[in-house]
Amino acid sequence: MHSELLDRSYHFLNFLPEVADFLVQKHKESGLKVDEKGLYNLVTEADLKAESMILDEIQKNFPLDGILSEERGKIDGKSNYTWVVDPLDGTTNYTHGLPLYGISVGVVETESMTPVIGMVFFPELNTYYHAIKGQGAFREKTPIQVSRTSSLKDSLFVTGFPYDRNLSLDTLMQYYKSILQKSRGIRRTGAATLDLCWLAEGKFEGYYELGLKPWDMAAAGLIVLEAKGKITSMDGNDFSILIPSLLASNGLVHEYLLAEFEGQINRVVY
């Protein structure tokens, strides 16, 4: 199993810079075509082309593996591995000329949907993060770990908002206000994979968000876990890429955050 994971990881760590270069070049062009999947959910021709590049590479080199991707959906495979792909996380940032976007490619065990490989590239930040289950987390070649901050007042948090802003917005604002008043602050980057990778290397102490999809957390979630972080749902259930809410932390402030959401999360519609 380990050699199979190394093979897949090594191959894509060498391939994904090609996709990153494409996105950077496309980002410099004017007249980027944008379609709306929803009021706040955008898709560009760059998303679709980047996804095709990644999926073609998977099917050419690992034809028995399954695929789950944001734009194309599910493609069943015959092996024990399924690739989980978000070709452009942070599309709204991308369309507005901001550099905070990434390419997320994870591999999960097909039956359990447990992440075993995570790779996230940030083309215009000129860096990438990666992990193999049981082997630690890395920013490029440097090992990374979550922060050791244990108090809320010294902690910096990050969050995101679901695409449907009308769903339980009042409750979400209550979370935001309560945590903001007890901590050093809350940030929002607009890219879940960036939030998780920055948490993994100690920039943030905690992250929470509702309405995430498997491709938002398969790769970056593993990177957090391998950086000795902790992940559950916002109501404390075990981590799965299929859960509809996510709470990630350095582990030391996790129970404090769970207490903020206690008795409230089941009131949120998503």
Task: Walk through the language-model features, giving the residues of each.
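N-terminal subdomain of lithium-sensitive/metallo-dependent phosphomonoesterases centered on the IMPase/IPPase/PAP
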Residues: 1-88, 252, 268-270
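Residue-level signal for inorganic ion chemistry
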Residues: 23-24, 47, 58, 91, ...
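A short, compositionally biased
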Residues: 29-30, 131-135, 225, 242
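Solvent-exposed alpha-helices and their adjacent loops that cap or buttress functional pockets
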Residues: 35, 75-77, 110-112, 130, ...
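Generic detector of well-ordered alpha-helical packing
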Residues: 48, 71, 87-90, 94, ...
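DPxDG-like acidic metal-binding loop motif
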Residues: 77-138
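An extended, acidic
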Residues: 145-270
